[in-house]
């Protein structure tokens, strides 16, 4: 998770899973990872731990690319598509390698991994280490007005998507990574160019099914 909204949606999903498995079960079996890269979660870690919904809550000191000065040379414009592609391949490999020491848990040991905003460093790490995962849209219907994958890879998008989805030579976010199994979105019809891996899982039913006890847990984590 990178934002409070991500944590909120994770609560909704985990509460639904708990209810379906055993309504009397109090302790969850999932690990919640809070990335510190783009948000200061303050004391959210301890507040979430107090709910008992997750087996453990970890903080991830995820590093942006500018933290590693050795990556800067791969961002230089060579003036040619093939030259830039060669640099991007090297960038993808090196970024994943450099990020590895900051990942706080062995993700290979998990059955299911859900990642919000896989455009962040964790997406590079997972794909270059051949770890399969499920992506989740960064914000509610966020792809309706801005498709980051297509914008960031404008110019020869289909070629870049192929190199990412099938060859894993570069990384394209939002469902186009080779090891991204699918990507959850709230409303596929709102997306102009949906990726074949998008699956529609509306958020409203997750909220509508909340019990009084569920709402108290949410208040405990986010308000009280």
Tell me what each language-model feature is:
Residues 137, 144-224:
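A nucleotide-sugar donor-handling region in carbohydrate enzymes
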Residues 1-175:
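Active-site and donor-binding regions of nucleotide-sugar-utilizing enzymes
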